[in-house]
Design a protein with these regions (language model features):
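N-terminal capping segment at the start of a domain
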Residues: 31-67, 377, 630, 634-642
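Short helix-loop-beta-strand segments that form the rim/entrance of peptidase-like active sites
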Residues: 314-345, 375
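Metal-dependent peptidase/peptidase-like ectodomains
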Residues: 44, 133, 233-234, 241-242, ...
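Extracellular/luminal Protease-associated
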Residues: 64-67, 71-74, 130-232, 296, ...
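Noncatalytic luminal/extracellular "stalk/propeptide" segments of secretory-pathway proteins
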Residues: 30-32, 46, 54-173
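His/Asp/Glu-rich mid-to-C-terminal helical/loop segments that flank catalytic regions of hydrolases
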Residues: 329, 460-512, 627-630, 649-667
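Second-shell loop/turn segments in exported
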Residues: 36-44, 57-68, 103-105, 142-146, ...
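Soluble metallo-hydrolase cores and metallopeptidase-like ectodomains found primarily
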Residues: 134-165, 220-299, 310-313, 317-326
Length: 667
């Protein structure tokens, strides 16, 4: 082990080497040939992507619902086929019982109509009924997966409504719970446990108070065994809540809710499109985006779906015109129901895995995925939504070459200064951010596949009735669409010299990142020595060894993956990632206490994308290292090095113990 002074010297030497390598690469040409990038950028139409989005938002696209199947069959599939693409629909069961990974599939939901009215107010004489919600006017005002029914009852404010404490001394039996919590949790407490007949959900006072007229997206998500006991719910705006509270101060307020909907077995509908590879068609570059979300919901994620449709058309058109040669590998587009559809897909295609030796593919090898680009909220007008575009870097548990490629193509896109004829001239300042969770790239990362998410954050319209087509921008569609399409094209067409160039650039990026971590480690050692800092340094030295062989192997994890028998045994993951919250149901009280303490210790510091790792993310990454060949000592070191946190072996052992009891890992 090096002394502190030696560590500082090593750090400076390493950092100097990183800067030298980076300066050499900075003067080189971009990874995507400029003529190829220009062909893609010139063909890709931001207006066409926006028009695709405009068509998609006409449908109430809820997972497992007939309208989700309808938008796939009536919009996405025919447009792909009209562009000359090979395309098909695939469906999986979704009934509130079938599990994919740790997620229970949603029930099918056929929604037809719904209304909520103020029926009477004791403090007002001769009150005329006041409409609070009509599905035809604001589709998001009906809680998704609401059970059909007709009820009237007195409103009772139960605060958040998600905890038994909210109902102490409060009688909601036969009444309607007025709450600010998540509808699924409110229904389970208020309706199933305490006898309420329905729920009305209002926004918390801290939730975007500058926009009191918005209605938030919310859902009930009943399981099959809850079908007889569940009920329906509505969302109202903050302004409507304030009006109701004013009336309730004068006396009892009764509301009347009526919903025409059916809950039962459904189907998760996926759309596939392919541009087949000519040399290794079994190796896929995967582009994904979720097609679901309520009617109107434009940026989330009709925008990603519309942008993907235009990306597929763009490449097919350029190939047909012989402006681009067909790709060597298959480019596979999948429009999915978020999480549930992706988990169903990988559960039913167990052959899917990372391609491994990606730069020297063997002919006629097994089907595999080289990389995944996930498009989720990509069309924002950044001024109207007060947001910025980003892509997520991959975590340390998967090969890191995708970070370098995406960074380089992003810079190339910035230099192109792209706009659409009917779009804005908004200043574009995109960025690369650390891995953040919350979309379908999580599932592929759990398979070991390098995966990135393209999106926007923050966005004040997210999951609200204000996420409409007028908040999209054809210029943003063109920029992000060209960026994603060019990156995918490189992955599907790169020859050995191009891969060598990417590996060299990735090597320099990795050296620079590890030097940054070592600089932080040296600061910790100087100011406040800790066990985590020592692990960080040890892991840095170990990863430095990996880097010496990376120029030959292509990624820092290859040595372990290719020769697992050389390494110690360790915990082995037994389930798909990410974990649903239900995965920890039934844990002993002592373990639940520890989990709660860790959630508080690693709490998110943002309502949007977290700027520091939270407990769910750290758990995800820890489990992704659990390959049966990585010891808990190594996992603690890897996590400490990645997040610059003091995570010791005892912490990992405790996590493994809990996961083992839940049959999520094997010790």
């Amino acid at each position: 082990m090096l002394s502190n002074s030696c560590t500082l010297i090593a750090m400076k030497t390493f950092l100097a080497f990183a800067i030298f390598l980076t300066s050499l690469l900075a003067s080189a040409q971009h990874l995507v040939k400029q003529e190829t990038f220009d062909a893609i950028a010139n063909e890709y139409s931001g207006e066409a992507a926006q028009e695709n989005t405009r068509r998609i938002v006409e449908y109430h696209r809820i997972q497992g619902s007939p309208m989700m199947a309808a938008v796939a069959e009536q919009v996405v599939l025919p447009r792909l086929k009209a562009a000359g693409l090979e395309a098909k629909i695939e469906q999986f069961g979704s009934d509130g019982k079938i599990k994919y990974g740790t997620y229970t599939s949603p029930m099918g939901w056929d929604m037809r109509s719904g209304e909520l009215w103020v029926e009477s107010a004791a403090g007002m004489k001769d009150i005329k009924p006041v409409m609070l919600c009509r599905y035809a006017d604001v589709p998001m005002c009906v809680s998704t997966y609401s059970k059909g029914g007709d009820w009237s009852g007195e409103l009772v404010d139960v605060g958040s409504g998600t905890s038994p404490a909210n109902y102490q001394g409060v009688d909601v039996r036969g009444k309607v719970a007025l709450a600010s919590g998540y509808a699924a949790n409110v229904v389970r407490e208020a309706v199933i446990k305490h006898g309420a007949i329905g729920v009305v959900i209002y926004p918390d006072a801290a939730d975007r108070p500058d926009h009191p007229g918005m209605v938030r997206y919310n859902g009930i998500w009943p399981r099959a065994e809850e079908l007889e006991k569940t009920s329906s719910g509505f969302q109202i705006s903050r302004n409507q809540y304030d009006m109701l509270k004013s009336l309730m101060k004068q006396g009892a307020v009764r509301v009347h809710g009526k919903i025409d909907a059916t809950l039962g077995p459904g189907k998760l509908t996926l759309v596939h499109a392919y541009i087949r590879g000519t040399q290794n068609p079994e190796r896929e570059v995967l582009i994904t985006g979720h097609l679901d979300h309520p009617k109107w919901s434009a940026n989330d994620n009709a925008s990603g779906s519309g942008a993907m449709m235009e990306a597929a058309r763009t490449l097919q058109t350029l190939i047909a015109a012989k402006k681009l040669a067909p790709p060597k590998l298959t480019i596979h587009f999948i429009w999915v129901p978020e999480y549930f559809g992706t988990l169903a897909y990988v559960s039913n295609h167990k052959e899917l895995k990372f391609c491994g030796n990606f730069y020297q593919p063997e002919p006629n090898g097994p089907q595999c995925i080289l990389a995944n680009i996930n498009m989720d909220m990509v069309g924002e007008d950044t001024v109207k939504t007060n947001s910025r575009f980003y892509f997520t870097r991959v975590p340390d548990s998967v090969p890191f070459f995708l970070n370098t490629l995406m960074s380089d193509v992003l810079q190339q896109t910035r230099e192109a200064d792209l706009f659409a004829q009917t779009g804005t001239r908004n200043y574009w300042q995109p960025e690369a951010i650390p891995y953040a969770q919350g979309s379908d790239h999580d599932v592929f990362l759990g398979l070991g596949v390098p995966s990135t998410m393209l999106g926007h954050d923050p966005d004040w319209t997210h999951h609200t009735s204000e996420d409409k087509i007028d908040k999209t921008d054809a210029s943003e569609f063109r920029r992000v669409g060209a960026f994603a399409t060019a990156a995918a094209w490189f992955l599907a067409t790169a020859d050995p010299p191009a891969w060598k160039k990417l590996r060299t650039a990735a090597y320099a990026d990795r050296v620079q990142e590890l030097a940054r971590r070592l600089a932080h480690d040296a600061t910790v050692l100087r100011d406040a020595p800790s066990k985590g800092a020592l692990k960080n340094r040890e892991e840095f030295e170990d990863q430095s060894d990996y880097l010496q062989s990376m120029s030959k192997t292509g990624d820092a994890q290859a040595r372990r993956h290719n020769n697992p028998q050389q390494y110690a045994s360790g915990p082995r993951r037994l389930t798909l990632l990410p974990l649903d919250a239900s995965a920890f149901e039934g844990v002993p009280s002592e373990d639940q206490k520890w989990l709660s303490e860790q959630e508080a210790r690693f709490a998110s510091d943002s309502e949007g994308l977290a700027t520091k790792p939270n407990f769910a993310l750290i758990t995800f990454e820890a489990m992704n290292f659990m390959d049966g060949h990585t010891s808990t000592v190594e996992i603690s070191a890897l996590l400490s090095a990645e997040y610059l946190l003091d995570i010791d072996q005892a912490w990992v052992n405790r996590l493994v113990s809990i996961l083992d009891k839940q049959k999520l890992v094997a010790k």
